[in-house]
């Protein structure tokens, strides 16, 4: 089976991309265990706890990221450069455990994937 990467690169709640990506990720996990999840650019904000989406009349789907472990989705990476550019660091508490990687290491991990879906 092919290895599938889910890349979250958009901020939460501005569009439905993050929620749709999470739904697709959880659905795909029922079909394969060979999944990798990447958070890059503004996608790093998907993992911040304590968001208030109701203020912009959006659904709070961020807590659903906590289910990744229950779905045996364990390969999660977050771009260290994206964290720094946004004033965050690897010590920031996130809703899931994601391993910080520099851009070159992130590209190597992505290169190991057969299919890349970006949200």
Swiss-Prot record:
Heterohexamer, formed by a dimer of trimers. The hexameric TusBCD complex contains 2 copies each of TusB, TusC and TusD. The TusBCD complex interacts with TusE. One of its GO terms (cellular component) is cytoplasm. It holds the Pfam family DsrE. It comes from Escherichia coli O127:H6 (strain E2348/69 / EPEC). One of its GO terms (biological process) is tRNA processing. InterPro entries: DsrEFH-like, Sulphur_relay_DsrE/F-like, Sulphur_relay_TusC, Sulphur_relay_TusC/DsrF. The keyword tRNA processing applies. This is Protein TusC. Gene3D superfamilies: DsrEFH-like. Its main location: cytoplasm. Keywords: Cytoplasm, tRNA processing. Part of a sulfur-relay system required for 2-thiolation of 5-methylaminomethyl-2-thiouridine (mnm(5)s(2)U) at tRNA wobble positions. It comes from the Bacteria. Belongs to the DsrF/TusC family. It is found in: Cytoplasm.
